């Protein structure tokens, strides 16, 4: 019987539930699971039925190419709070909503092998390059806006308890009081731009900052957030 259960996705997070604290067994089982599916770079939420050495577990998951983002409120909560690792409420899944509009950028890539002797002209095929989701309404508590293949532009604010998650950049032209997660899947060049920063959590490519650690000099200001050369979050106030 497996000691790790992958019970599905919470938005675009995968929830891992551990029934063992034997990290050798966890490594062995997860390696097998990861080899069978496309989980590389996946953002994961941690739950456990047994006590864990949380820091060691997080390091183990990172070494396997996963991105631990938070724990579910429960056995792991106290240890997570002690290291300022995010804790999510138990059994309160968010409602994934549809963006007001989605724009798809496509490119034509030459397929050199498919040429004809008469013309020697490469046959082209169309591939999706990038998507941008536009949303014009306030993101309410319990709602989540997700773009797995590009950027999000939110032309309104977001309430506490809401989430915006993009594999690329995030632009929010309003108050940010929820959780903003850019570069989901491991894109370190992703950036966040927001009109008024009061976020509960900020993350780019798995590097996160909880509300208490956001620099006080950028709170409620227009901010540009990115990863520096040391893969640390930088918060730059925008002057207009």
Swiss-Prot record:
One of its GO terms (biological process) is division septum assembly. Signal peptide: none annotated. It comes from the Bacteria. InterPro entries: CAP/MinC_C, MinC, MinC_C_sf, MinC_N, Septum_form_inhib_MinC_C. Interacts with MinD and FtsZ. Cell division inhibitor that blocks the formation of polar Z ring septums. Rapidly oscillates between the poles of the cell to destabilize FtsZ filaments that have formed before they mature into polar Z rings. Prevents FtsZ polymerization. This is Probable septum site-determining protein MinC. It comes from Acinetobacter baylyi (strain ATCC 33305 / BD413 / ADP1). The gene is minC.
């Amino acid at each position: 019987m497996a000691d790790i259960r992958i019970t599905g996705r919470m938005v675009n997070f995968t929830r891992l539930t551990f029934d063992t604290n034997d990290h050798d067994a966890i490594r062995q089982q997860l390696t097998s699971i990861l080899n069978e599916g496309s989980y590389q770079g996946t953002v994961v939420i941690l739950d456990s039925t047994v006590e864990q050495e949380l820091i060691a577990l997080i390091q183990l998951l990172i070494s396997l190419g996963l991105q631990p983002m938070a724990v579910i409120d429960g056995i792991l909560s106290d240890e997570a709070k002690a290291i300022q690792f995010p804790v999510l409420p138990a059994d309160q899944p968010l409602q994934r909503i549809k963006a007001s509009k989605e724009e798809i950028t496509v490119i034509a890539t030459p397929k050199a092998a498919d040429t004809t002797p008469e013309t020697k002209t490469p046959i082209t095929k169309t591939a999706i390059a990038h998507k941008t989701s536009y949303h014009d309404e306030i993101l309410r508590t319990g709602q989540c806006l997700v773009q797995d293949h590009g950027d999000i532009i939110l032309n309104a604010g977001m309430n506490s308890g809401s989430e915006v998650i993009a594999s690329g950049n995030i632009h929010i032209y309003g108050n940010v009081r929820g959780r903003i997660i850019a570069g989901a899947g491991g894109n370190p060049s992703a950036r966040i731009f927001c009109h008024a920063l009061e976020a509960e959590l900020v993350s780019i490519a798995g590097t996160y900052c909880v509300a208490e650690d956001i620099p006080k000099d950028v709170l409620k200001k227009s901010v540009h957030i990115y990863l520096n050369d040391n893969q640390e979050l930088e918060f730059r106030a925008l002057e207009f």
